Regions:
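Generic C-terminus detector
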Residues: 368-372, 376-432, 436
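A conserved helix-loop-beta module that forms one wall/lid of the active-site cleft
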Residues: 90-152
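Short acidic-hydrophobic, aromatic-tinged amphipathic segments that line or gate anion-handling sites
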Residues: 43-49, 121-125, 156
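Solvent-exposed alpha-helices and their adjacent loops that cap or buttress functional pockets
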Residues: 21, 36-38, 60, 90, ...
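Active-site "cap" helix and flanking loop/linker of ATP-utilizing ligase/carboxylase catalytic domains
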Residues: 246-268, 285-358, 371
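Internal nucleotide-binding/catalytic subdomain
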Residues: 152-293
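ATP-binding N-terminal substructure of ATP-dependent carboxylate-amine bond-forming enzymes
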Residues: 1-95
Length: 436
C-alpha cells in the first residue's frame, strides 16, 4: 500500500514514524514533511492546504491511502475531494469537520442531543454579546466560531477582559471571518483532560487520554501556546470516568452526527473538563492533537495503519488495540520569544547524542530546516523530545536528561512538564494492565 501523510509538524512525524514500520506500507510519502520525517518517508514540497497540489501528488505517486494531519485541509474538504477521485482517506468530510470548524455548530449539537457542555449563547452582534456578558459577569469564556489557529478562545477572569475579547473578534476582526460569530459560555471549573477515539461513522474505539500544557511558562504562567508538552495516559481519567466519557459524550456525538446526515470518520479529539457534575465537553477537534499525538503513538503496540483503515472503512467493530504498559511524556522545545515573534535560522546541535542517550527516547521534528549538513530552527515550536517510563516521573527524568544533551542556546522549554500527574500519589505506581 502506498500511503501519504499530509502535514509538516511533530504530529505528522509521529504518524510517519509509526506507519513506516507497518508491513502493509510499501511506500510512505509526506507533504510537505520536515527534515526529521525524511528518515521515515519521502517528503514532497506540497503545502498541506494546497488541495489541488495534493490531488496531483496522489495521482502521480499512485497513492492508495491518505492520512490528513492538520485541521485546515479537513475543514476545507480535502477528504471529500480525495474520496471523489477514488482515493481512500483517513479524516472527516467537510460537513463532519464542522465539529471543529464551528464552535456554534458543536454547541447546538450538544444542546439538541443532551451532550454535557457549558451553558452558552451565540452572537453575531457585538453589542448584544456585551450586554449578555455584563449580565452574567466573569469568569466567562468567549470563543470565535471558526478556526483561529488555537488563539480564538478567551477565558476571561474579568468582565473587562471578556468585553475586550468581543471587540477583538467582532470589531477589530482579529480572526477574520472566523470571528464574525462568537460563542459566549459559562466558565467550567475542574481539571482539563484530552480524550481520543477512532470513529468509523457509527462506532467509536477509545484511543487514549493525555494532558497537555498550554501556557508557555513553568507553573502554567504566561500566554497560551499550541502546547509546550504532554503526557499519556492522564492519571486523572480513571476507568470509571473514561466509561462515562464514552457513554455520555463520544458515542452520543457519533450517533448525533450520523442522524444529522454528517457521519463522522476519523479521530475525534475531545477537550474535556472534569467537573463535580462529571465530564463536560469543552470543544472538539477532528484530528490528532499536537503534541498529544506524540505521546499517544509511542504507547501503541498495535500496527497503526490497519486501525486507521478500519475507521475509514466502517470496520471498527472487531478491532482491538494493544498498548504498552508505560507512560509517554513529551517536552516541546521552541525558539526563544515563542509564542510571540521568534528568531529563525539558529543551528541546533546534539540531536543525535540526545536521541542515543536512552532507548526510550524519540525526537520528533516540528519546525526545522536542513541547510547543508546543519539542522536549523525555523521559529515557533521546533522539536518534541519524547520519553517513555513506568511512571510520569521516570519519563520526565529521561526526557529532560536527553534535552540537556541538545546544544541550542536560542531555544527553550518548560522544565515542569508532567507536574499535575507527579503531584498525585499514584503517579509513580505501576500502571494497570489496560491503559488505552
Amino acid at each position: 500500500m502506498r500511503v501519504l501523510v499530509v502535514g509538516s509538524g511533530g504530529r505528522e512525524h509521529a504518524l510517519c514514524w509509526a506507519l513506516s514500520s507497518s508491513p502493509l506500507c510499501d511506500a510512505l510519502f509526506c507533504a510537505p514533511g520536515n527534515p526529521g520525517i525524511e528518515d521515515e518517508a519521502a517528503c514532497v514540497n506540497v503545502a498541506s492546504d494546497d488541495i489541488d497540489g495534493i490531488l496531483k501528488l496522489c495521482k502521480k505517486e499512485r497513492i492508495d491511502f491518505v492520512i490528513v494531519g492538520p485541521e485546515t485541509p479537513l475543514v476545507a474538504g480535502l477528504v471529500d475531494k480525495l474520496e471523489a477521485q477514488g482515493i481512500a482517506a483517513f479524516g472527516p468530510t467537510a460537513a463532519a469537520a464542522a465539529l471543529e470548524g464551528s464552535k456554534a455548530f458543536t454547541k447546538d449539537l450538544c444542546a439538541k442531543y443532551n451532550i454535557p457542555t457549558a451553558k452558552y449563547q451565540r452572537f453575531t452582534d457585538a453589542a448584544a454579546a456585551k450586554d449578555y456578558i455584563r449580565k452574567h459577569k466573569a469568569p466567562i469564556v468567549v470563543k470565535a466560531d471558526g478556526l483561529a489557529a488555537g488563539k480564538g478562545v478567551t477565558v476571561a477572569k474579568t468582565t473587562k477582559q471578556a468585553l475586550a475579547a468581543v471587540d477583538a473578534a467582532m470589531v477589530a476582526k482579529k480572526f477574520g471571518a472566523a470571528g464574525g460569530e462568537i460563542v459566549v459560555e459559562d466558565c467550567l471549573e475542574g481539571e482539563e483532560v484530552s480524550f481520543f477515539a477512532l470513529v468509523d461513522g457509527t462506532r467509536a474505539l477509545a484511543f487514549g487520554s493525555a494532558q497537555d500544557h498550554k501556557r508557555v511558562g513553568d507553573g502554567d504562567t504566561g500566554p497560551n501556546t499550541g502546547g509546550m508538552g504532554a503526557y499519556s495516559p492522564a492519571p486523572v481519567l480513571t476507568a470509571e470516568l473514561e466509561t462515562a466519557v464514552m457513554e455520555k459524550i463520544i458515542l452520543p456525538t457519533v450517533h448525533a452526527m450520523r442522524d444529522e446526515g454528517r457521519p463522522f470518520k476519523g479521530v475525534l479529539y475531545a477537550g474535556l473538563m472534569l467537573t463535580r457534575d462529571g465530564p463536560q465537553l469543552i470543544e472538539y477537534n477532528v484530528r490528532f492533537g499536537d503534541p498529544e499525538c506524540q505521546v499517544l503513538i509511542p504507547r501503541l503496540k498495535s500496527d497503526l495503519l490497519p486501525a486507521l483503515m478500519a475507521a475509514r472503512d466502517g470496520e471498527l467493530l472487531d478491532l482491538e488495540l494493544q498498548w504498552r504498559n508505560e507512560v509517554a511524556l513529551c517536552v516541546v522545545m521552541a525558539a526563544k520569544g515563542y509564542p510571540g515573534a521568534t528568531t529563525k535560522g539558529s543551528e541546533i546541535r546534539g540531536i543525535d547524542a540526545a536521541a542515543a542517550a536512552d532507548s526510550t527516547i524519540k525526537i520528533f521534528h516540528a519546525n526545522t530546516k536542513r541547510v547543508g549538513d546543519k539542522l536549523i530552527a525555523a521559529g515557533g515550536r521546533v522539536l518534541n523530545i519524547v520519553a517513555r517510563g513506568r511512571s510520569v516521573r521516570e519519563a520526565q527524568k529521561r526526557a529532560y536528561a536527553a534535552i540537556d544533551k541538545i546544544d541550542w542556546p536560542q531555544g527553550f522549554c518548560r522544565r515542569d512538564i508532567g507536574w499535575r500527574a507527579i503531584g498525585r500519589r499514584r503517579a509513580s505506581a505501576p500502571l494497570p494492565e489496560k491503559t488505552p
